[in-house]
Amino acid sequence: MTRMKVNQMSLLEHIAELRKRLLIVALAFVVFFIAGFFLAKPIIVYLQETDEAKQLTLNAFNLTDPLYVFMQFAFIIGIVLTSPVILYQLWAFVSPGLYEKERKVTLSYIPVSILLFLAGLSFSYYILFPFVVDFMKRISQDLNVNQVIGINEYFHFLLQLTIPFGLLFQMPVILMFLTRLGIVTPMFLAKIRKYAYFTLLVIAALITPPELLSHMMVTVPLLILYEISILISKAAYRKAQKSSAADRDVSSGQ
C-alpha cells in the first residue's frame, strides 16, 4: 500500500484496521497465557534452585500465595511471548504510511528490541539481583534479625527489579524509531538531558532498595544508555536527512 492510498483511507477504515491488529494481539495473548500455565512451574522451580533462593527459606503466609505466584508468572510469560506479536502488529499498522526502505528498517527493530529486552533482564538478574539479595542478608545479619521471606514477596521483588530493566533497555530502539518518524531529534534529546537524567534517577530509586551502591548500579547504566540513545538518534537523524535530500533531488529532476 502506497502513501497515497493510505492518505485516501477513511477514518472508519483506519479504525477497522486497528481493530483487526488489536484482535490479533488479544488472541495471541490468550494462546501464550495458556502456554504460560505449562511454563510457569518449571520456571518457578528453576528460580528456586538458584544460589540466591537456596540461601533463603521461602514461606507461604497466605493459602493463596502459591497460586498468586503461579498466575503472576503465567501472565508475565503471556505478555513476554506476546510482545513480538505486539511489535509486529504495530509495525504492520504504521508501515503503509512508510516508504519501502523505511518499512525494512523499522521491521529490523523488532529483533533488536527483543535482544535489548533480554540484555536488560540478564543484567538485572545475574548482576544486580544477587548483589541486592546479598546486601539485604548482610544487613539482617548485622542487626541480628532472622529473615522470614514469603514466596510472594520474593518473586514480586525479583520481577520488580528485572522486568522494568528489560523495558528500560528498549530506550535506544524507541528513540531511534521516534527519530526516524521525525517525532524527536537528537538536538531535542540533548536539550532535555537534565530532565531525562532526573526521570531516570527517580525510576532507579523506585526499583532499588534505599542504598547508595545498588542505586548507582542501576542509575549509571541507565544514564549511559540514554547517551547511547542520543548517539544512535544522531545517526538515524543524519540518515533520514540524507534520504529526504535524495528524495528532493529526484523530485526536482522530474
From Swiss-Prot:
Record's signal peptide: none
Major place of residence: membrane
Cellular compartments annotated: Cell membrane
Alphabetically ordered keywords of this record: Cell membrane, Membrane, Protein transport, Translocation, Transmembrane, Transmembrane helix, Transport
This protein's record includes keyword Metal-binding: no
Gene Ontology process terms (BP): intracellular protein transmembrane transport; protein transport by the Tat complex
Keyword Protein transport listed: yes
Transmembrane intervals: 24-44, 67-87, 112-132, 157-177, 187-207, 212-232
Family annotation (Pfam families): TatC
GO terms for cellular component: TAT protein transport complex
Coiled-coil region list: none
Protein's membrane topology: Multi-pass membrane protein
Top-rank lineage group of the source organism: Bacteria
InterPro entries registered for this protein in UniProt: Sec-indep_translocase_CS, TatC
MF terms in GO: proton motive force dependent protein transmembrane transporter activity
Assigned protein family: Belongs to the TatC family.
UniProt xrefs under PANTHER family: SEC-INDEPENDENT PROTEIN TRANSLOCASE PROTEIN TATC, SEC-INDEPENDENT PROTEIN TRANSLOCASE PROTEIN TATC, CHLOROPLASTIC-RELATED
Physiological role: Part of the twin-arginine translocation (Tat) system that transports large folded proteins containing a characteristic twin-arginine motif in their signal peptide across membranes. Required for YwbN secretion.
Quaternary structure, from the entry: Forms a complex with TatAy. Two types of complexes exist: one composed of TatAy and TatCy, and another composed only of TatAy.
Note: B.subtilis possesses two minimal, substrate-specific, Tat translocases: TatAd-TatCd and TatAy-TatCy, each one composed of a TatA and a TatC protein. TatA is bifunctional and performs the function of both the TatA and TatB proteins of Gram-negative organisms.
Name assigned to this protein: Sec-independent protein translocase protein TatCy
Phylogenetic lineage: Bacteria, Bacillati, Bacillota, Bacilli, Bacillales
Gene: tatC2
